Regions:
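Polyanion/phosphate-binding surface patch
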Residues: 49-51, 66, 253-254
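C-terminal auxiliary extensions adjacent to catalytic cores
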Residues: 2-23, 27-34, 38-41, 46, ...
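Cysteine-centered functional microenvironments
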Residues: 135-140, 317-321
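FAD-binding core of FAD-dependent oxidoreductases
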Residues: 54-68, 72-76, 83-108, 136-158, ...
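Membrane-embedded alpha-helical core segments of multi-pass
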Residues: 127-131, 149, 158, 220
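Glycine-rich, flexible loop motifs
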Residues: 2-13, 19-50, 77-135, 227, ...
C-alpha cells in the first residue's frame, strides 16, 4: 500500500500501520504545491533582500554574524551536513531510522522549511527502497533539534555518509551508483532544514509509545494470570471501589481485570487470605497510572509529529522568515522522561508479583518446582527480573533536568531530549523482558492449581503460550524459555 504524505493528521497508530505494513510513501498534490511554493518564496526573498537570513545567508550557531556570499550558499549547506555528522556509539535501530525518515518527510511537506521538491523526494526514495542511513545514538543534545543524528540520516542523499541496504553496509556514494541516483545538489537553507528538527527524538518517542501501549495491555493479562496462580481475590477490582476515586486509567484497569477473570473457577473458590499484597491488590492504581501517563505522553507526541520544527521558519503566506526555537526538544523531552518512569513502574510491580509466586506461600511450592532442593526451579528468573528492574530505575533520572551550553553560549539551554528518547526505549525493552519473566512464572504456578481452570480468556492465552514454552518439571537452562517468552509477547495478538 501507499501512504500519501499530506496535511491530514498523522497518528501514532497510523505510523505503526505504515511501518509494520511496509507501506510506501508518496507526496500528495497539495504537499507538492506547499513545498514548491515555499521554495519559490525563499528564492525570491534571497534575491530581493540585502538583509541577513539566519542559516541561509549567514553562518550557524555563534557564527550567525558572519555573512555568506551568494556563490557560497550551496557549499555552506553541504559543509553544515558534513561537519555536523559527529555521532558515536551504537547504531539507532533500523525501525526507528525508518520512522525518522517518515517524520522528516512529513515535517518538510508542510511547506515551512524552504527545501526543494527533489530533496524531499530523495528522502522518500530512501524510505520506499528500505534504505537505512547509519545513524548513531549519541551526539544530539536535543536543541538545535537533532543536528547530529539528522546529519547522518540525510548525508546519503548527497552521496555521503553510510547506509544499510539489503543487509549490506555501504557509503552514500556507493548507494547512489547502485540505485542509479544523482546525488542531490543542495540549495540555500536546505542543509539546515534537513538537520534542524526533532525527528530523532520524535521517532524514539513514537517507537516507545507503540511498545508501551502494547506492554500496558499485556501487563493486565499477565497480572490476571499471576493473581489466579497466587489464589488472589477479585474484590479489589469492584467498580464501586474505583468510582470513589475515578482516575480514568484506574477505572479502565479495574474493568479490564474483571473482564479477564470473568468465568474463572479459581477466582470463585473460597479464599483463606483476607487481602492480597499491594502488587496484586493495587493493580488498578498502578497499571492505571501507567495508562494515564501513556495517554498524556501520546497527546504530546501527536502534536509534535504533526508540526514543523525547522529554524528559521519560512511562512510564505505571511511574508515572514523568522529565526525562532521550534527545534527545541523540551516539549517532548519532559514527557519522555515521564513515560520512562511509568514503564519502569510497570516492571517494578511485575517483578514483585514474580517474587511472590516463587516464595513458597499460598500452597505453591518453593520456586514453583515439585521437588525443591535437588531442583532450584524458578529461583533465578526472579533474580534476572530484579536486575533488569533495577537497571530501569537507574535510567529514570530525567534527562530533561540537565542542560549543557553549546556553540560558544549562543545555544545556552538544550533539552537533552535525545538522551531521554534513547533511555526510554531501553526501559521499554527492559519492561518487556520483566513482564515475559512474570508470564513464565505465572504460567508455571497456575499448573499447581489444576484441575481448576481460570477464565476462558486466560486459558486461551496459556494454551497459546504452552505452544512455545513448556511446563518445567526439572532443572534445565532457563534462558531459552525466557527468550521464547519475550518473543511471545512481541508476536502474539493482544487486544
Amino acid at each position: 500500500m501507499t501512504h500519501q504524505i499530506s496535511a491530514e493528521h498523522l497518528t501514532i497508530a497510523k505510523i505503526a500501520e505504515i511501518i509494520e505494513g511496509h507501506h510506501t510513501l508518496k507526496l500528495s498534490a497539495d504537499a507538492v504545491k506547499r513545498i514548491t511554493h515555499c521554495r519559490e518564496y525563499l528564492d525570491k526573498k534571497i534575491a530581493e533582500s540585502d538583509k541577513p537570513i539566519y542559516g541561509v545567508t549567514t553562518g550557524f550557531g555563534s557564527l550567525c554574524k558572519i555573512s555568506i556570499s551568494n556563490d557560497q550558499l550551496s557549499q555552506l549547506q553541504i559543509n553544515l551536513m558534513m561537519s555536523h555528522a559527529c555521532g558515536v556509539g551504537e547504531r539507532v535501530p533500523n525501525d526507528i531510522v525508518k520512522i525518522m525518515l517518515l517524520l522528516k518527510v512529513q515535517s518538510l511537506s508542510y511547506g515551512y522549511s524552504g527545501v526543494k521538491l527533489d530533496t524531499v523526494e530523495r528522502l522518500i526514495d530512501l524510505f520506499n527502497n528500505d534504505v537505512y542511513p547509519v545513524v548513531y545514538k549519541q551526539g544530539s543534545v536535543g536543541a538545535s533539534g537533532d543536528l547530529v543524528p539528522l546529519a547522518h540520516l540525510c548525508l546519503p542523499i548527497v552521496g555521503l555518509g553510510e547506509v544499510e541496504y539489503k543487509g549490506e553496509r555501504m557509503s552514500g556514494g556507493e548507494l547512489c551508483k547502485k540505485m542509479g541516483w544523482e546525488p542531490v545538489k543542495l540549495g540555500s537553507k536546505e542543509g539546515l532544514a534537513l538537520l534542524n528538527g526533532t525527528q530523532n527524538m520524535s521517532a524514539h518517542a513514537v517507537w516507545a509509545m507503540i511498545k508501551a501501549e502494547r506492554l500496558s495491555k499485556w501487563a493486565d493479562v499477565i497480572a490476571a494470570i499471576s493473581l489466579e496462580a497466587y489464589d488472589g481475590r477479585v474484590e479489589p477490582f469492584t467498580h464501586a471501589v474505583h468510582a470513589v476515586r475515578p482516575h480514568q486509567g484506574q477505572i479502565e484497569t479495574a474493568a479490564r481485570m474483571r473482564e479477564l477473570l470473568d468465568g474463572s473457577e479459581l477466582i470463585r473458590q473460597p479464599k483463606v487470605n483476607v487481602q492480597d499484597p499491594y502488587s496484586f491488590r493495587c493493580i488498578p492504581q498502578v497499571h492505571g497510572s501507567v495508562k494515564d501517563t501513556i495517554r498524556y505522553v501520546g497527546s504530546v507526541i501527536d502534536t509534535e509529529i504533526n508540526s514543523a520544527t525547522d529554524n528559521p521558519t519560512v511562512c510564505p503566506d505571511e511574508d515572514l522568515i523568522i529565526s525562532a526555537g521550534n527545534f527545541h526538544g523540551e516539549p517532548i523531552a519532559m514527557p519522555m522522561d515521564f513515560l520512562c518512569i511509568a514503564m519502569a513502574e510497570l516492571s517494578n510491580i511485575s517483578e514483585r508479583r514474580t517474587y511472590k509466586l516463587v516464595s513458597g506461600t499460598r500452597d505453591l511450592p518453593s520456586f514453583l518446582v515439585a521437588h525443591p532442593g535437588v531442583n532450584s526451579g524458578f529461583m533465578i528468573p526472579q533474580y534476572t527480573a530484579a536486575a533488569i528492574a533495577s537497571q530501569s530505575k537507574t535510567l529514570c533520572m530525567p534527562s530533561s533536568a540537565d542542560t549543557i551550553p553549546t556553540s560558544q553560549g549562543q545555544e545556552d539551554h538544550v533539552s537533552m531530549g535525545a538522551n531521554a528518547g534513547v533511555k526510554l526505549c531501553k526501559v521499554c525493552e527492559n519492561t518487556e523482558r520483566v513482564l515475559a519473566i512474570e508470564l513464565f512464572n505465572a504460567a508455571q504456578a497456575l499448573e499447581f492449581r489444576r484441575p481448576l481452570k481460570s477464565s476462558p480468556v486466560l486459558e486461551h492465552v496459556i494454551a497459546d503460550y504452552r505452544k512455545v514454552v513448556p511446563f518445567i518439571n526439572e532443572d534445565q537452562p532457563m534462558y531459552p524459555h525466557i527468550a521464547k517468552s519475550v518473543e511471545f509477547l512481541q508476536n502474539e495478538k493482544i487486544d
